[in-house]
Amino acid sequence: YGWPATSFGINYSGARITPLTSAEGITPPVTYWTPSIAPSHLLIYQGALFEAWQGSFLVSTLVDQDVKRLTLNDNSVTDSESLFSELGARIRGVHEGPDGAIYLLTDSDPGSVIEVRPKTVDSANEP
C-alpha cells in the first residue's frame, strides 16, 4: 500500500515521513488520521448482538483511547463514531466473541479485558 514511500504521517520529531502522499501504482488509503490515532487493531464486526454494527469496521486506538466505528460504502467511509472513550484507557485490541459480544483489551496499568454487551431492559433496572 505504499508506506513508507507514500504517507500522510509524521515522525515523532514532527517531520513528515515522506513528502509524497500518492504515487503511481500505490493504492491510497480509504481513510487516515492526522495526527495519528495510533490504530492498534481492526475488526469487521459480523455478530448479531449489535445488529446495527454488522459489517462495520471497529478500529481500536491508543492515542484517542477509544474504538472508531467506521461504516464503508463503495470503498469510502460514510460514517464514523467514537465508542468507549469513557473508559479512559488505551485500547490495544477489539475482538468479537462467538456469540457477538465485543471484547476490548486495554494496555493501561493494570491491563484488562472488558466484555461489551448491549444493555437489556432488565439489567437497566438493576441497582
Where are these regions (language model features)?
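Beta-propeller domain segments
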Residues: 1-81, 89, 99, 111-112, ...
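Short, exposed beta-strand-loop hairpins at the edges of beta-sheets
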Residues: 102-107
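Boundary/junction segments of secreted and surface-exposed precursor proteins
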Residues: 123-127
